[in-house]
């Protein structure tokens, strides 16, 4: 299973070997953005998320939370989850976008590592597939923009297309 589309160079390599690859969507996944339950912030727009994860916003007080430096957590760069979040949240779907994660972002090896860090750090924010959500983290509601409805990451909202950080799995 993969959380990203087949890359052009992968298709070309397969064809060189006589294989004609194709994708089959087998599931949908929502990427939950999570904070520690002690964090009072419960909703953010995609623009606010982009500003946090790129380092433009560095303190929770700017988002209505405590005066505390934001600790950014991300999956490692070779993770499909990392790539999807960068392309669809930081770069807002712009294929020519240059936005990157903040230099101080902590790159962790697994979604479970992000879940554990968020559970123990009141200033942390991270993201992972909805299946990792538990009561030791708080999933925040996300809106496409400040004029849109804030939507919680849950199965119904992913299936209906309401949740803005959803992706197919292949």
What is the predicted role of each segment?
Residues 1-170:
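Exported/periplasmic ABC-transporter solute-binding proteins
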